[in-house]
Amino acid sequence: MVAQASGKEVESDKSAKEKRKVTEASSDDPQPGIDLVRKESLTSSESFPTVECSEFQSMAFLQSLGKERLVEGIKRRIRIKKFKSLESPALKMTENKATQNSKVEFQDELYKNTLKYSCNSLSPGVENNSTLKLHDCSCLSHSKDCNDENNLAYKPDGGCMHVPENSSKSKKENPRSLIDKTDPSNIPQLLQTEENLMRVSQLLLEENDSYLSKNNGMFSCLQSEKNKHSIEESSIGRKSRKRMKVSEKGNGMVIEMKFSNMCNKSELMLQGNQTGAEGKETETLEAKKSSLKVLRKVNNNTLSPMDPLLSLPETGKKTSPEHYANAVFQKAVEQLSKEETKNVSQPLGCTSMDPPEDYFKSMKNSLVKSLSDCFPIEKRSSREGLKNEAEESKYSCHRTIPMTGKRTWPCYSCARISAQCWKKASLPQSSRQDDFLRHQMNQTHLSDSKLMLQSSVTETNSASSSIEKLDSNLNCLPSVSTVEPTSVVIKEPIVNDDEKMKSEELSRSASEVVSNITEDTPLTNVTHNSTGSKKKDRGNLTKLNLMVASQDGQEASNSTGKTVHRKACITKQALVVPDLVKILNTGRLTNFKIPLLKNKTEKRKEINAKSSEREVYSPLELLDSLSGAEVRQSRTKENTVTVTSGPQSLSIQHSVIPVQASSDSFCSKNSCIIAPSFLKQGNNNKPSSHISASGHIISNKAAGSLTVENNTFSCDPGCIEKNPTFYSNEQEPFKAVSSEVSGRKMSKNFSEIKVGFPDILKAYEDDVLLIDVIQDDPDLFGVSSEGELSFPSEVPLISQEPNVAEEHQSADSKHMELPEKKEPSDHLRELPVPDPGSVKSEICASLSAASEIKHDSKDANISLGEVTHETSSNEKPGGLSEQTKSSDLDEKCRFSDKVAIREEKETISEVFRSDSKNTEIMVGECHLAALVSKPLCLPVPLPPLNLSTHQEDTLLNPWMNDFRLPGKHSLLKLQNPEICEIFKREKNLGVFQKPLGLIIPHRYCKFHFNTIRGCERSQCKFAHVPEQGDEKVCMDVFKKYISISELCLLQRAANMFMEYYRKFLPGIHFDLQVLNDLLNSLLKHCLLKEVFQIMNLCIMIKMLPALKILLKIFEYVATMKLRNAVPALIDMFCKLVEAGMVLDLEHFNYIVKLLYQVQASKQEITAVLEMKSRLRMRQFKKNWKCDLEAALNEIEHCKEKGDWTKLGNVYLNIKMSCEKFADFQRFCAYIAEILTKDCKEERPGVPFCEFAETVSKDLQNSEVDKTLLGRIGISAMYFYHKLLQWSKGRKVLDKLYEKIHCTSLKGLIGPEKLAPRCQIVNIAAEIFLKSGSLDGAIWVLRESEWIINTPVWPCDRLDVLNRHNLLCTIAHEILAKSLYRQTFEVLQNLPGFQNSQETVEVSQYSLLFNKLLDACIESNSLGMSSSVAEFMISKSIPIDFSFLRRLITSLGRSCLWLKARAHYKSALSLGCYPPLEGNLYRKLLLIPSYLSEIEMLLAIEIFLVSNASSIQSPGTSTQMLQIVLKRSEENKSRSKDDYQAAVERLIMAARISDPKLFIKHMTVNVNKEQVYSLEHCSALKWLKENMKWGVKVWLFNNR
């Protein structure tokens, strides 16, 4: 290894990545993890990624400190140093060995799970991938050469190193013994690491002096920790496993050394020497601390895929550190240290895991210390915390310990997690863990031991999520960052064997996994794409690291970060272990089959390289975040608020995701797909080596982290295929894998990846068996409290077992109930939907992990975005027992995860703030950040919802609440692609647009009115609000909407009510009961705003709702403690009382009582009491007004006394008090009877008039009141019409004429209640006519628009006849008064003229019209005469020709030539004059002698126009135009004088023309008729001037 590493020093990027991978792989040992991390940084100091990551993390940290400008300069300097720092090949080799050793242990079990999970190792493309920039520092692009000479191979998933032939032995050995072995082996590596660190520190120190001067405090912390690491490393032995530890420490120390070198090279050396004096554990712990600090500040150490593996074994130990973190919260450092020690001894396959615990503890303490330096979080010294943690780890059971740290598990407790479980060191590294999860996923695919792999993946997921949240800084250090969250988690799970660890990890991952699952596609189809372009990844990682660093710094300020990280780590682990829950429940470890995979080492190398590259999260950052989390936990315990701020409301999972360095770096739980940038990274590592089994679903965060770290992407192939954006950024799309994992097909890349794996025997050796865990052990799984959300992470893991998935569903269905914001996003299609089985299994894992964590219930409330549950419709209701168990675990996880979530949210918010400036890191990161940002926006967590397992199975569990940063879109809406298809299919089929059964007029939008979803057109041409007169439509719509009682429909009804009655007043169709029902429904659906709006509008339109509605509003406000709504409610109440609402004393007392409950002010209560006193003054002394029976008795009394004024007052009182409109109508009918029947004629007054006068004085009269009063008047009118009491009837009509338009109303009683409108109008007109009021009669007719018989107002033939007689009578009377216009109006509206339905012969009206025409002509009313003539001609009414001729003559003499010519032409068509056509064109005009001069002139005009062509032609000047004055038969009998007068009229006609015409007398014909000739010149002149209009009038306008 050393030779190889040294040989590859030239390849800075690859060697750095590889070294980092090796370091992470060696992170199995707690100390080695630290050493490895440091070594990675040292070795990777040679590799550019290491330097970059540390640089970026430190810069992120600086950003958090507000020194963003320095970050860029430091980055540049560190980059320069990176090139210089390519020096520690030995360290690389050591790290690789250590990583391989640790990986061997995990790989045993991972290989077991490999077949099922198709763990895709990093393909050789990983080698090509230099370090990911996001994880720059620690990211080791593990090249094949990095493998040990002993054929140590990197597990693709965890990045752990396969122990060479002795791995199986090490597995068999007691975890303690393994740990012991590891410790000595770590010593030489630590020495090497120390040297490397020294070198790196020197390089960094040289160029970073200015930077150090600015950030002395932070670097000092880093330096102290680095020195400790160096001393520890020097003190550690040279065993292979310990080499792994050393390598891990080396990585962490390299990072630390980098910063420390930046701070003081000598100082690091001195501190390292001093630290060397301390014991191994203490050194390891310190190394961890320092490495964590370094990571935290540096953020440059990118965890390679190996780092997650190393971190996983370290996680095993870190479980104890995790316990220690809890202890730190409890301030029981010593006990926690003992537990760590025990945990270290307990891990089955990974001796390195124990050192990682110590390391993790040390890292925690160092992190805390550094945090305390930067942000005073803990006063406890890092060394003391480390020692205590180490002791606890030794003596305490590695059982899941509540995040709060209230309890530590005794070493003798039953359930323990195998050492194989990666010490949750990897978990702390959120981004690392994400990558690590991917690596673990790969390993899981590679190994059959799903439990182990899942646990590791879960740990990784949890770590990644926690890292994401705690700090993107952790992204830099693969193993170190991993160590921290894992340590927290491992303390809880380490108690038992691998299973227990897995369960813990599952629980941890459960929280994160839930969130991660939303982001990640199901692990079943997860593919790990390691592209040769690691530089891109490294750049992305570096960005993320910077983001993470800043976030980590912020997280350090927020103590809650630790808890959040823990939970996040736990959730991620749960994600990785879908089947682990089953194993834990069933305890059937024997059922695990260890699949044989070929070329496992190569894949592992690739994966490790990827994981190391991506897992850039530094353990220091994790420790900082954890220490912050501890403080935050305490704060959280004190403060029940789940979310301190909007960003803090982010779920743990979101915060855990380290991949997203920027504010967008946080993945939303709902996003099932990793952003395209992640895919890009994953695919950039061209070999898509990582494919997770169906059982392995990495939470979205975990997947995202995996993609960053391992360049892997976990998702269902189908889902991936559906997501073009997945491939948009990817160089190569995911390829289907032929091999099946857990019965699922893996992508072809998996087979390709297999080529790089080592021997099958080694795979067996690397695997570790799980030990049965007591399923119902409350100590292990914790006690869940009902009502709490099971997963803060909220995304169920997808397991291959549908039963498990159902369990998760049951547990997560509670989350499902929480409202999920489903906002359409471009990425919606891009998110693959996890398989139901894998989701279930992951849910179980997350449940178990969550149960182990046991945090305060205060944090149980998860922000809305965090509480979503994913279940696939394909899941079957099987395995209820498992589901129940998982749900229990889930509940437990809920509790613990909730606390972690809150803390993690806080951390995330801090990280988000610090990294908000780095929004452009990666597209995928941005998507994840967008998803995470949404929870940040939620200020208040939602209460947990409980669902039964059956309900959970049936419910379609949404993805994690679609939390998104501004401008971001949720990546996933539906959990299952089939569900998506069904949804689309149903939408296309219009399933959701099913008509509601309303009959809507065509002019209205049927979608808006008649469907639940409403109109979706951007611009609809149809009306969305009823128009005036369609109040009945409004009422029908309201009734239908109220009956359906859908929230959207009720809101629409409220809007429709507001829009309609703002424009139009209530009419006869207004139903007060509908209003009350609408208000009641709105109130039931908590639509208080709409209720207030409608109530205020009702006050304006004087339609008061029922009193019970008002009381319900007060009750609602008091129950919900809506103090802010009290002022508006009091104001509305006062208006209602002023408007006439009557309240009893009891009502006022009740309202006051409610106001006291809501803590209303004295002024508000006083206002209510004042209204009470005012109302008393307005009320009658008797209470009968509210009693209808008493009111009726009062009415009888009024009737007997004839006190109609008092009756009006009673009417008003009843109107205000009566709640039901129907009752009020019946009351009005009774009033009408009183006013009409049994009235004594001798009484001069009209009861209705006095009654109407009193009622009309009320200013509060609405349109409905007027309508009812009018209907009472109609009944009275009928009554007097029957009695022929025309005067009284007219008084009634006069009163209605003043106040009400009654022509469209009907009576309330008797036949008038069903009488047609024509009949009512006829009776009213007749009363006016009989009483001598023609104006009144015409007013009634005009108000009714002269309607007789229409489809809307049908009537009988008798009514039509009555109308005819009535109009004729009125016409004669009006004509007698020379009211021609009114007469003509009446005649025009006779039956038969309005529509075709009136089959009346209009010719019978000839006498009336001719009489009118004659009268108009006689009176010289030419305009009216002309109108009457035109109407008669148009309606074919026979007209008297004499009247028409007189009209034409009068019009001509009055110079109204246009009308005269028109009527003359009409007269010609009617035959009034002899035809002219026969002689017109013969140049001969025959004019009857009886015509007037006007008629003669008009005849001459026609003659000239007809012969215009011949007259105007030049050759016809000699032709003669003759006019013959024809004698008629009548004229023959007359005297000569008459004919002579005709001759004079002819001459006059020629003169009055314009221009004048000249005629000559030529001769007398045989009939003694005078013959005249028309002079050609005058005719030609006339044509020139009048030809244009002449042609139009006489030739073309023939009728």
UniProtKB/Swiss-Prot annotation:
The alphabetical list of record keywords is:
Cytoplasm, Differentiation, Spermatogenesis
**Composition bias type Polar residues, residue spans:** 874-884
Q: From what superkingdom does this record's organism come?
A: Eukaryota
- Function recorded in the entry: Important for normal spermatogenesis and male fertility. Specifically required for progression to the post-meiotic stages of spermatocyte development. Seems to be necessary for normal expression levels of a number of testis-expressed gene transcripts, although its role in this process is unclear.
Q: Name one GO molecular function term.
A: metal ion binding
Return any one Pfam family short name. Asp_Glu_race_2
Q: Which GO terms describe its cellular component?
A: cytosol
Q: In which tissues is it expressed?
A: Expressed in both adult testis and fetal ovary, mostly in germ cells (at protein level).
| Protein name per Swiss-Prot or TrEMBL | Protein TOPAZ1
Localization, UniProt: Cytoplasm, Cytosol
* Basic and acidic residues: bias regions: 168-183, 805-832
Q: Where is the signal peptide?
A: none
Keyword Cytoplasm recorded: yes
Organism, as annotated: Ovis aries (Sheep)
An example GO biological process term is:
spermatocyte division
Q: Does the keyword Cytoplasm apply?
A: yes
TM region(s), chain numbering: none
- The record's region (Disordered) falls at 1-42, 159-185, 802-836, 867-889
